[in-house]
Amino acid sequence: MDYYELLGVSRTASADEIKSAYRKLALKLHPDRNKEEGAAEKFAQVSEAYSVLSDTEKRAHYDRFGSAPGAGMPGGDXFGGMGGMGGVGFDPMDIFEQLFGGAAGMGGRGRRGPARGDDLETEVRITLEQARAGEEVEVTVDRLTECEHCHGTRTEPGGKPPVTCSTCNGSGAVRGQARTIFGVVETQQVCPTCKGDGKMVVDPCTVCHGRGRTLKSEPVKVKLPKGIDEGYRIRVAGQGNEGPGGNGDLYVHIEMEPHPELHRQDENLIFPARIGFATAALGGRIQVPTLDGPQEVEVKPGTQHGELHRLRGQGMPRLQGAGTGDLIVDYEIVVPKHLNAEAKDALQAYARAVGDEVPEEHEGLFGKIGKLFGRD
């Protein structure tokens, strides 16, 4: 079994690439979401692959010897744990919760008492129109929520209640001693048996496997502040993972959908307006797209290339401060590459009228070659 092949990454993949690959596969194969035959075993396999490849020392050992450290060692169960995976006491759910958060993962280890659920992060792409109006958008979030079967008790309904952990006597922590330069000091660590809970489940819930929570995809409403821009993030309180000590928060990262015609520059919007030479010289009217719809704008006679015209109050609301930005029309004078005979005559007449030098008719390549050799 090739760990790199399991995760679908190359042997030179970075830590971020390995993490991203595992994240996608774990969400797809998680037992709470995928009931297909073999999904649980595949979930365990990709979890073990990630547990090895995400650890620098374990990955180096695997790259050198083709196996994880300790695999197949005497006294070890080469096929122990969930899904027939190697490693003594290996639990793929622990690997999952360390990445996605959970009381048995990042949120609970090292804490005493009820643990708060972990914070979650996601992203949403919005339009300029949505950012300007401060609309409410919806995102779908994968959250750990209370198991509906056991209601978070972790015990199968009707089963035997949890018992006090014999290792820590229900305290959730174990004491020890450590030798330091200041002498021997007393230490306290999370109980390795009950993982800080103080109790051991006797009859685990058949749905959540004794964890008290299951993974669910849920819609979350997010109110956009007016004028929000790319790179900002919004905190939605209580929409992270659920935990016995309260819910974590959800952080939504903002990405902007490119507008087909307008460019944003802080609170201002820029419209590159391409106009012809005649319109620039004589003036005229053009249609300018705004977030409220097309607006007719007058082009003054003698408009120069790069000249700016400001439509006040037609930009974005200032995110921090009062007022609204402007929509700036940036004129770009387009010089035609090809002219018909009538247009050429008109421009030559104009040039003579204003005293501009009129260039001679452009000769083709064969005409120049003919002159070079004395041909008419």
UniProtKB/Swiss-Prot annotation:
Binding positions for Zn(2+) 1 per the UniProt entry: C147, C150, C205, C208
GO cellular component: cytoplasm
Subcellular location, record wording: Cytoplasm
Ranges annotated as CR-type zinc finger: 134-217
Record flagged with keyword Metal-binding: yes
InterPro entries: DnaJ, DnaJ_C, DnaJ_domain, DnaJ_domain_CS, HSP40/DnaJ_pept-bd, HSP_DnaJ_Cys-rich_dom, HSP_DnaJ_Cys-rich_dom_sf, J_dom_sf
Broad class of where this protein is predominantly found: cytoplasm
GO terms, molecular function: ATP binding; heat shock protein binding; unfolded protein binding; zinc ion binding
An example Gene Ontology biological process: chaperone cofactor-dependent protein refolding
Cofactor, free-text remark: Binds 2 Zn(2+) ions per monomer.
Pfam family, any one: DnaJ_CXXCXGXG
Protein residues bound to Zn(2+) 2: C165, C168, C191, C194
PROSITE patterns found in the cross-reference section: DNAJ_1 (PS00636), DNAJ_2 (PS50076), ZF_CR (PS51188)
CXXCXGXG motif repeats, residue ranges: 147-154, 165-172, 191-198, 205-212
Cofactor: Zn(2+)
Keyword tags: Chaperone, Cytoplasm, DNA replication, Metal-binding, Repeat, Stress response, Zinc, Zinc-finger
CDD domains: DnaJ, DnaJ_C, DnaJ_zf
Keyword Transmembrane helix among UniProt keywords: no
Family that this chain belongs to: Belongs to the DnaJ family.
PANTHER family: CHAPERONE PROTEIN DNAJ (PTHR43096:SF48), DNAJ HOMOLOG 1, MITOCHONDRIAL-RELATED (PTHR43096)
Description of its domains: The J domain is necessary and sufficient to stimulate DnaK ATPase activity. Zinc center 1 plays an important role in the autonomous, DnaK-independent chaperone activity of DnaJ. Zinc center 2 is essential for interaction with DnaK and for DnaJ activity.
Quaternary data: Homodimer.
Function of the protein: Participates actively in the response to hyperosmotic and heat shock by preventing the aggregation of stress-denatured proteins and by disaggregating proteins, also in an autonomous, DnaK-independent fashion. Unfolded proteins bind initially to DnaJ; upon interaction with the DnaJ-bound protein, DnaK hydrolyzes its bound ATP, resulting in the formation of a stable complex. GrpE releases ADP from DnaK; ATP binding to DnaK triggers the release of the substrate protein, thus completing the reaction cycle.
Protein name: Chaperone protein DnaJ
Annotated source species: Deinococcus radiodurans (strain ATCC 13939 / DSM 20539 / JCM 16871 / CCUG 27074 / LMG 4051 / NBRC 15346 / NCIMB 9279 / VKM B-1422 / R1)
Gene: dnaJ
